[in-house]
């Protein structure tokens, strides 16, 4: 069975985090919400608290992931960008030839991790300056 890890940071956008988890789980995909906040409770950009399945410190190296997923939202995307564990996991995933995904503002995290060089990418309107040398 496929396995997806979705990283959550305070300031995430609710629909971008929860809709993919809902659809994937309904489709039989093992989907694990991972908090990077040092606690399982993660607070969205609009004050909704979600309880993650794991904290990043409990999750291992994510080598069993088929996809690492990043929801957008602010300041959630910048919180993800600034977390070295997230960046390292994304880089390992890409080096292994496995998938990474980012929604709305979160492609800025992929750019920061150096994963968008010469690749097509999209981002929330007006944030294209965060994509580095990606093809926008």
Model-derived regions, located:
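Histidine-anchored nucleotide/phosphate-binding helix
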Residues: 19-21
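Active-site-adjacent pocket-lining segments in enzyme domains
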Residues: 2-12, 23-36, 53-136
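Short N-terminal binding/cap micro-motifs at the start of the first secondary-structure element
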Residues: 12-17, 41
């Amino acid at each position: 069975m496929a396995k997806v890890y979705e990283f959550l940071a305070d300031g995430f956008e609710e629909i971008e985090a929860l809709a993919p988890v809902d659809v994937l789980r309904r489709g039989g995909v093992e989907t694990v919400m991972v908090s990077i906040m040092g606690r399982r409770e993660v607070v969205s950009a609009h004050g909704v608290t979600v309880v993650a399945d794991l904290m990043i410190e409990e999750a291992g190296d994510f080598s069993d992931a088929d996809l690492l997923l990043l929801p957008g939202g602010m300041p959630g995307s910048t919180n993800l960008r600034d977390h070295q564990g997230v960046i390292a996991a994304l880089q390992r995933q890409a080096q292994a030839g496995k998938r990474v995904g980012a929604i709305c503002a979160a492609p800025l995290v992929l750019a920061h991790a150096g994963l968008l060089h010469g690749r097509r990418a999209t981002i929330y309107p007006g944030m294209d300056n965060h994509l580095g040398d990606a093809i926008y």
